[in-house]
């Protein structure tokens, strides 16, 4: 439960909605197929995170809060032949404050975390700029 609590703090977002994803196929090197739903009544809870960590239900966090502010953002890279080591080296070379994770389908998620909340539009602009710079 401790990990679920920590993830709930790190990936805090909307308190009004979250997403779920039920996997129908999970073939590495292909976009994972499944059913995505947006639950418009409540943000993600520790229970949602626990189910996600146990593989019971995929979880999608909406990073934008009710004031249109974010504390984190992500770039989703659906290139399955992506060399993660090269990507990480490029990020380190440019001293970018990013964290790279392999996605379940074999692509990557590149996360940017902030110390203070910022306007969502500013985060989106910066992530687009970074994505273009990384190629």
Predicted features along the sequence, with ranges:
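Histidine-centered divalent-metal-coordination microenvironment in nucleic-acid enzymes
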Residues: 75, 98-126
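Anionic group-transfer/hydrolysis microenvironments
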Residues: 78
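A short linear hydrophobic-aromatic micro-motif
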Residues: 59-61, 95-101
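DNA replication initiation on ssDNA origins
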Residues: 1-72, 81-87
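Helical (often loop-to-helix) elements that flank the catalytic cores of nucleotide-handling enzymes
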Residues: 84-93, 113-135
